[in-house]
Amino acid sequence: MSKQVVIVGGGVIGLLTALNLAADVDQVVVCDQGEVGRESSWAGGGIVSPLYPWRYSPAVTALAHWSQDFYPQLGERLFASTGIDPQVHTTGLYWLDLDDETEALAWAAREQRPLSAVDISAAYDAVPVLGPGYRHALSLAGVANL
């Protein structure tokens, strides 16, 4: 008996579900109202880091950490199996002139994340188009994007 699966929704969740099921079933069909992979996941499917992670619950933090550590491996797997480069780029992330900088640094120490205060010139060097007037910067190394 042949195993067939139909997945409704061609966003990041539907496509990853199809990818993982493909090894165990005979046929996977993905249906979407528009072009597969081009709806909301096209814009937001690569965002796995809350913009201000220290402001979120431990559950969101745990999920974000796992996802951030997993995405580079997933990108390599997708490229190897499809030949399509998902363009995972590790760029890091800067926050400028935060009101809750102390809380951010405490969160990073508690969660063992590589967030640190850096001289504002480092942010200006890394992001030359940054407008003038910023005085303080935090940098989180290792943040990737798609």
Regions found by a protein language model. Give the residues of each.
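FAD-binding beta-loop-beta segment adjacent to the flavin cofactor pocket
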Residues: 36-37, 125-130
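Dinucleotide-binding Rossmann-like beta1-alpha1 core, especially the glycine-rich loop
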Residues: 47-126
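N-terminal Rossmann-like FAD-binding beta1-loop-alpha1 element of flavoenzymes
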Residues: 3-30
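Fold-independent oxyanion-binding glycine-rich loops
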Residues: 33, 51, 142-143
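Glycine-rich FAD pyrophosphate-binding loop
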Residues: 22-44
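Short, flexible turn/loop "capping" segments at secondary-structure junctions
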Residues: 42, 87-88, 130-133
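Conserved redox-cofactor binding core of oxidoreductases
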Residues: 92-102, 129-146
